[in-house]
Amino acid sequence: MTLDLLEQLESKIQNTVDTIALLQMEVEELKEDKQVLTEKGEQLQAENIRLTEEHQKWQSRLSALVGKIEETES
């Protein structure tokens, strides 16, 4: 009876150890995914800033052109 209990306990402990190992691998994968997503997010933010600045420049140029057109029409 005691031997059976010890074998059951050993089996449960081994299952727990295996589960912990799998969870640790999953955590590492998730950390890597998080790093990739963080880098991608930073790239997208930089691209957004660049595009916003470019948009503002074009708006300024267009406003200047509209102003010149209005001056010539006056």
From Swiss-Prot:
Gene Ontology CC annotations of this record: cytoplasm
One BP term from GO: FtsZ-dependent cytokinesis
Coiled coil: 2-74
UniProt entry keywords in alphabetical sequence: Cell cycle, Cell division, Coiled coil, Cytoplasm, Septation
Gene3D superfamilies hit by this protein: 1.20.5.340
Localization per Swiss-Prot or TrEMBL: Cytoplasm
Coarse class of the protein's main subcellular location: cytoplasm
Top-rank taxon: Bacteria
Pfam families: ZapB
Record-stated family: Belongs to the ZapB family.
Job of this protein: Non-essential, abundant cell division factor that is required for proper Z-ring formation. It is recruited early to the divisome by direct interaction with FtsZ, stimulating Z-ring assembly and thereby promoting cell division earlier in the cell cycle. Its recruitment to the Z-ring requires functional FtsA or ZipA.
Assembly information from the UniProt record: Homodimer. The ends of the coiled-coil dimer bind to each other, forming polymers. Interacts with FtsZ.
Full protein name: Cell division protein ZapB
Organism: Psychromonas ingrahamii (strain DSM 17664 / CCUG 51855 / 37)
Recorded name of the encoding gene: zapB
